């Protein structure tokens, strides 16, 4: 049995949520939510249909000592939501840059979850980067609004491959600079 470890990834609190490292016990809810095509289609990496073992492998990678990405569960227990509402992540691009990613389960859409946690993590800047990037698919304007409302500036159009769609999808790229 593999023990759970937390390698200097902080547990932090927003007004309504606890952002914490993944636990193996999160597997069922993460798998349930990511099997939803509406979630998978708005990410680059979640396949649809979700193959057996994918969530367990994802959790294993997130708990690895040599990971390049910090992933937090958006835990909604203190707001009487689910223990897993979604995920938010920061991937180290280099020593001065990171890329923000997130998804929220459809049951919690339009409740301010993404806005609250994106603002919190981007303001906290836990990797102490000079710049933080984020990209959203152009058919997801709600996520674009979240980013602009949280202080990110639009910088360009691009494309990213979406595993669930099995195609390249137009994106908008955003940047937040720190002093």
Region locations from a protein language model:
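Acyl-donor (CoA/ACP) binding surface of acyl/acetyltransferases
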Residues: 1-37, 75-179
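Conserved GNAT-fold acetyl-CoA-binding loop/helix
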Residues: 38-60
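Short, hydrophobic secondary-structure boundary micro-motifs
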Residues: 41-43, 71, 99
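Juxtamembrane/interface motifs at transmembrane-helix termini
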Residues: 49-53, 61-63, 105-106, 138-140
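A short helix-loop-beta-strand connector motif used in the catalytic cores of GNAT acetyltransferases and
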Residues: 60-73
């Amino acid at each position: 049995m593999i023990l759970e470890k937390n390698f200097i990834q902080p547990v932090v609190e927003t007004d309504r949520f606890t952002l914490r490292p993944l636990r193996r016990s999160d597997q069922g809810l993460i798998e349930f939510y990511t099997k939803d095509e509406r979630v998978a289609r708005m990410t680059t990496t979640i396949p649809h249909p979700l193959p057996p073992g994918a969530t367990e492998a994802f959790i294993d990678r997130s708990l690895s000592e040599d990971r390049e990405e910090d992933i937090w569960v958006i835990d909604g227990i203190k707001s009487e939501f689910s223990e897993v509402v979604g995920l938010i992540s920061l991937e180290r691009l280099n020593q001065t840059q990171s890329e923000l990613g997130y998804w929220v389960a459809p049951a919690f859409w339009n409740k301010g979850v993404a806005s609250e946690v994106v603002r919190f993590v981007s303001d906290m800047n836990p990797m102490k980067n000079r710049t933080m990037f984020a990209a959203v698919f152009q058919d997801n304007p709600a996520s674009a609004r979240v980013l602009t409302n949280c202080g990110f500036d639009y910088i360009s159009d691009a494309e990213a491959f979406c595993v669930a769609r099995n195609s390249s999808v137009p994106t908008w790229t955003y940047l937040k600079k720190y002093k």
